[in-house]
């Protein structure tokens, strides 16, 4: 749900700026139902039929992940994360290998970010989600979640209570009140898995999680714009990318207002409230799932701690602070289009 408008717009406007080979034409496919957001695939192909086959194969693969990682809906014959949440504390549930691999990856991101990205925060995030939806629907009566409710929910966010039995292929929540929410990672992770078998030379955006699968057929780079969080026209920067992901977390994407103060959706596990260090963080990283997690973690960390995390994985970032000043990791400027 986060980060789609700005980067998607950039994909649509900037994706075809470089020249293409004469024998191939630029095509674009858009799908609306995956991960409750917009998926756009841009690429070059010798014919519309050839591009359609490619885009439909990608859509089919993403749809499988969408159903498995969904925490809100059930699907015939599919055991998904909603199934797991409903089975908390009852019994181990046999899951598809894709769910097992996602949860293992989420645990790795949790460890790497010292708990700043915690998929076991579902109970806390649900309280904020309900308050935000109610506040958007009825702004005059918008309220914050009750402090006592947040503190009670936070008692059920211990990721060690998630028991993964790889040999049996089962998942069990030892805490019956624990609830998983993989929104900080799921889209990027799914996109990365699909891109492992996708053709080279595509630009794919899933809710703004942008992944290039290589240079264009003529060797040119894709160009992606980074939105100004102030809402002003134009981009903070445009970056040239080939085999890399571009993911942004920002305070301007999903929020509501209570007593004149905006409250966005990126919740700090330590405070149980929205992070206030940054307005936006954009991450450049070869792995889209990791980029998704890092963009959330860096949004909640001081720059020095965020930079140390980037150094660990060889990724780059752009931070926008509360005064709309820009801060760069050492290698970020190498991607900026001049």
Each predicted region: which residue ranges?
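Mature catalytic core of soluble alpha/beta enzymes
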Residues: 4-338
């Amino acid at each position: 749900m986060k980060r789609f408008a700005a980067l998607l717009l950039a994909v649509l406007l900037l994706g075809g700026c470089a020249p293409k080979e004469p024998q191939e034409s630029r095509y674009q496919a858009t799908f609306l139902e995956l991960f409750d957001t917009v998926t756009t695939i841009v690429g070059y192909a010798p014919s519309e039929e050839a591009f359609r086959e490619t885009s439909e194969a990608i859509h089919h693969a993403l749809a499988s992940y969408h159903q498995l990682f969904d925490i809100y809906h059930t699907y015939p014959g599919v055991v998904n994360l909603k199934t797991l949440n409903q089975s908390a504390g009852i019994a181990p549930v046999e899951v598809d290998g894709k769910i097992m691999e996602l949860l293992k990856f989420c645990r790795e991101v949790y460890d790497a970010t010292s708990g700043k990205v915690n998929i076991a925060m579902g109970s806390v995030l649900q309280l904020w989600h309900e308050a935000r939806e109610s506040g958007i629907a009825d702004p005059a009566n918008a309220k914050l979640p009750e402090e006592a409710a947040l503190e009670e929910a936070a008692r059920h966010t211990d990721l060690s209570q998630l028991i993964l039995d790889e040999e049996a292929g089962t998942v069990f929540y030892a805490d019956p009140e624990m609830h998983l929410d993989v929104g900080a990672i799921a889209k990027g992770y799914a996109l990365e898995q699909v891109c492992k078998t996708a053709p080279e030379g595509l630009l794919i955006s899933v809710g703004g999680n942008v992944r290039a699968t290589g240079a264009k057929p003529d060797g040119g780079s894709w160009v992606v714009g980074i939105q100004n969080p102030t809402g002003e026209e134009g981009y903070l920067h445009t970056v040239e990318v080939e085999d890399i992901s571009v993911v942004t977390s920002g305070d301007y994407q999903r929020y509501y207002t209570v007593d004149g103060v905006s409250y966005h959706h990126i919740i700090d596990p330590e405070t149980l409230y929205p992070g206030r260090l940054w307005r936006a963080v954009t991450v450049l990283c070869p792995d889209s799932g990791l980029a998704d997690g890092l963009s959330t973690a860096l949004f909640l960390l001081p720059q020095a701690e965020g930079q140390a995390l980037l150094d660990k994985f060889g990724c780059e970032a752009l931070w926008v602070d509360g005064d709309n000043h820009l801060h760069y990791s050492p290698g970020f400027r190498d991607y900026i289009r001049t």
